[in-house]
């Protein structure tokens, strides 16, 4: 547990920001699943011995989403977007990557993130609560430009970058290791909409646009890793890395919508703590807490206890 904060308390705070619905994810409630593949580059195997990084093509399940807990949120509303990828390994197991349009988290701890959500609860005193929070968390003021960037409205799920917030330790076959952060970069040019243009769009235009785009061919993202430098924190997701060493380790190719998963009680969870041989989670407290919140959220919305299927904390 993180500093006395429980997963249920975190979920209550998340739902308190408005729009949450029973039976839906606490965040990123509105999303769509897609099928595709992943093929690693030759550079990947030099960085990690993970089985999906050996250069062979593996199946992938991809989910694009809006960040809100409101499953009916209009796609034209400003907000963080998410892209998650589940790689199926040769032995049938899976490993996950979770990324979003925000480059950094607003806090280095679960408690700090939840305190901000509590300050954002809709109500007459919201402006005062937010002002007080900003005054007592001066680092957040410096992050405001990045937050505005993260909340831009993309013209397509396929025209914006997504970033993993946490560090992972990649271990190569020769035993060498390094910490990395993940970035999913579209091969299409980045494109965003103005607020006025977005207001004229249909409520589900991002899903509709991607469906039309896929009719013309696959959508691709470069999977890049940023390798930590000596001064880059591996445990603070609110701290920007100074390292400019970035390596493309593969390509995610999205071929079409998924029609099999999340039907008839099937549950899909994209958990960044679900790693595999050659990849280890850092000691980032937010990363460690996330898997507990995911398990609690699954139980609340479905009644199912993930139990042994949940990654180790």
Curated annotation (Swiss-Prot):
Record-listed E.C. numbers: 1.11.1.-
UniProt entry keywords in alphabetical sequence: Heme, Iron, Metal-binding, Oxidoreductase, Peroxidase
Catalytic site: 28
Gene Ontology BP term (one): hydrogen peroxide catabolic process
TM stretches of this protein: none
One GO MF term: iron ion binding
Subunit structure and binding partners: Monomer.
Name listed for the protein in its UniProt record: Catalase-related peroxidase
Organism lineage string: Bacteria, Bacillati, Actinomycetota, Actinomycetes, Mycobacteriales
């Amino acid at each position: 547990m993180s500093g006395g904060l429980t997963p249920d308390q975190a979920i209550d705070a998340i739902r308190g920001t408005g729009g949450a619905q029973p039976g839906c994810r606490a965040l990123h409630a509105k999303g769509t699943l897609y099928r595709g593949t992943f093929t690693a580059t030759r550079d990947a195997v030099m960085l990690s011995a993970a089985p999906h990084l050996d250069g062979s093509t593996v199946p992938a399940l991809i989910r694009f989403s809006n960040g809100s807990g409101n499953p009916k949120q209009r796609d034209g509303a400003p907000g963080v977007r998410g892209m998650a990828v589940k790689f199926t390994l040769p032995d049938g197991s899976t490993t996950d990557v979770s990324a979003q349009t925000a480059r950094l988290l607003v806090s280095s701890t679960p408690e700090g993130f939840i305190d901000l959500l509590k300050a954002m609860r809709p109500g007459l005193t919201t402006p005062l609560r937010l002002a007080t929070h900003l005054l007592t968390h001066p680092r957040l003021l410096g992050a405001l430009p990045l937050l505005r960037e993260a909340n831009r409205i993309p013209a397509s799920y396929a025209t914006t970058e997504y970033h993993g917030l946490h560090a992972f330790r990649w271990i190569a076959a020769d035993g060498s290791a390094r910490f990395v952060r993940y970035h999913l970069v579209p091969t299409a040019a980045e494109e965003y909409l103005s607020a006025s243009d977005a207001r004229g769009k249909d409520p589900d235009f991002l899903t509709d646009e991607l469906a039309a785009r896929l009719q013309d061919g696959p959508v691709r993202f470069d999977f890049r890793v940023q390798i930590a430098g000596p001064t880059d924190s591996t445990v603070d997701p609110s701290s920007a890395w100074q390292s400019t060493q970035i390596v493309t380790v593969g390509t995610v190719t999205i071929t079409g919508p998924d029609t099999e998963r999340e039907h008839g009680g099937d549950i899909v969870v994209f958990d960044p703590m679900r790693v595999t041989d050659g990849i280890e989670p850092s000691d980032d407290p937010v990363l460690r807490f996330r898997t507990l919140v995911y398990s609690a959220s699954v139980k609340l919305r479905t009644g199912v206890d993930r139990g042994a299927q949940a990654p180790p904390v």
